[in-house]
Amino acid sequence: MHCTVEICCGSYEDALVAYKGNADRIELTAALYMGGVTPSTACVTLVKRDTDFPVCVMIRPRGAGFCYSHAEFECMYEETRDLLNHGADGIVFGFLNPDFSINDEYTAKLVELVHANHKEAIMHRAFDCTSADTRALE
């Protein structure tokens, strides 16, 4: 039985170490000390150039929670489009409302964009901050 090994990488160098260590795929971020934020397109491009495993990229403009303004969401949406065009195999994200429920509107819009590009949409640790109800699982 094969277990998929995914490594959270905070840099291009981290990704190369994961690749040499035979990881199956990575979640690429930046600034892990802040819980991870969106890496640069240059970082994604280099990782895709120098490895051949799937690279799922975090979309998060800042630390300090997962509740975003409309302007922040618009930037995240456009950044997602850009990262998909630069080879991201999946997008890792999470949108919450002020009451810690999942922001269905933002989530649906980003999932639609990612799936329209035939890539994987992945909810990150924002899920761990949700209200403890089964609706979050849907």
Q: In which residue ranges do the predicted regions lie?
A:
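Hydrophobic faces of well-ordered beta-strands that scaffold small-molecule active sites
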Residues: 3-7, 26-28, 55-59, 91-93, ...
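Active-site beta-loop-alpha junctions enriched in small/polar residues
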Residues: 8-12, 31, 58-64, 96-98, ...
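Glycine-enriched alpha-helix->loop->beta-strand junction motifs that scaffold or abut catalytic
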Residues: 20-26, 50-54, 87-90, 115-120
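Conserved, mostly hydrophobic/aromatic
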Residues: 18, 47, 83, 110, ...
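Catalytic cores of alpha/beta
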Residues: 10-21, 65-82, 128-138
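N-terminal pre-domain/capping segments
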Residues: 1-26, 31-38
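Hydrophobic, well-structured mid-protein blocks that either form specific transmembrane helices
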Residues: 87-138
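Glycine/small-residue-rich loop that forms an oxyanion/phosphate-binding "nest" at active or ligand-binding sites
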Residues: 40-107
